[in-house]
Amino acid sequence: MNKVGLKQNGRFYYGWILMIVGFILMSLAYTGSISITSVFVVPVTEAFGIDRGSFLLYQTVLTLTAVVVTAYFGKRMAKGRLKLIVVISALVAAVGYLLFAWAKAVYWFYFGAVLIGVGFTNCTVLPMSIILNNWFGGKVRGTVMGFCFVGSGVGGLVILPILNSVITNSGWRTGYIALACMFGIVAFVSLLFLVKTPQERGFTRMGETAEETKAVEDAAGMNIKEAIKTPMFWLILATATLMVFGSSAILFNSAPFFIECGFSTQKAALVASFNLGMLAVGKIFIGFICDKLGTKFGSILSGAIFGLGFLSLALMPMNPNVFVFGAVICYGIGGGGITVCPPLLVNALFGEKDYGNIVAAMNMATNLGGAIGGTIAGVIYDITGSYVVFWCIAAAMMAVVVVFRVICFKLRKKYTY
């Protein structure tokens, strides 16, 4: 349907409820897997007497698990019982966080991270990208995904200060129990509300023509086998990897870095939560820009602004109270494209012929970046005593992202679908 509104054929359009459900899942599952890491770094490393790189290695295990899980479940979600996969995966992640809470040594975190990696992958971007692509067409898809994925930012803004207070007053083990409970809520909400396709509720996809609501295999574009033979595919995957390589370093190390810059523990946690709050604004902004000015412009703008964020971080030790504003604003606006742009880039560059498999490949690329970025930043800190070197490397990587995305859209002109 071309018309975009709250109702379709006289009934409230259920896709809007799914947008809110996605917001909740991102608020709890994404924040609970990734965004909260930095507030645990200091208390856990001090409790076990380990360096930051050793602790943050669990995030590498988590995200490498996510790469494998995405490869296995991407097609199964697109073609099979998506809701069942999400519910079971959320419960698996809850068990993982209970292992964290009961940890007797650092290797407990590595085992638990495998379970959390399953929940992180199967309860956040991958299923919601598939669901929202089924329910919403190109006229509104970017904005809808922006509102959905903004949950990770809003969730961080709300949850991070609360979690920091829990850790301060009751200990980090209690903090991990709270995260296990959050994944229990994810399972419950998913069981009640997730609906994979509009046809299951008697609707058609909103924001597209009737012809564009055909089955994915009948839509125009490339399948995964055709896509992997093009430079465009590998370049766009590289940009997704590089964006998350930098982002994961901020998520995992921001609070310790702000403390190194002279902020108190409470102020550092507050600024880290502001980072995530600004990310909420950025996701809505980038989604809106992609809808109104095109995915090309929105995705390139995202990479450029994100690079300015890393430059601000590199300059923070010189004047923390000034450059922190640039870091927070640019991280939020630029980082807003990290989850919003990849599914839109799949539509823009490869069409909908094999959307589920190609978006799964994009998800694998983002997870690969997350697997190494935060840990490498921690290792560089352990070696040099500073994060500045990493921030400079990340800023250079964002310049590469911009160039690669420009090239991809030039290559796209060769294809007629």
Report residues per predicted region:
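Helix-loop-helix hairpin linking two adjacent transmembrane segments in secondary transporters
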Residues: 148, 152-199
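Intracellular juxtamembrane helix-capping segments at the cytosolic ends
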Residues: 44, 122-136, 337-350
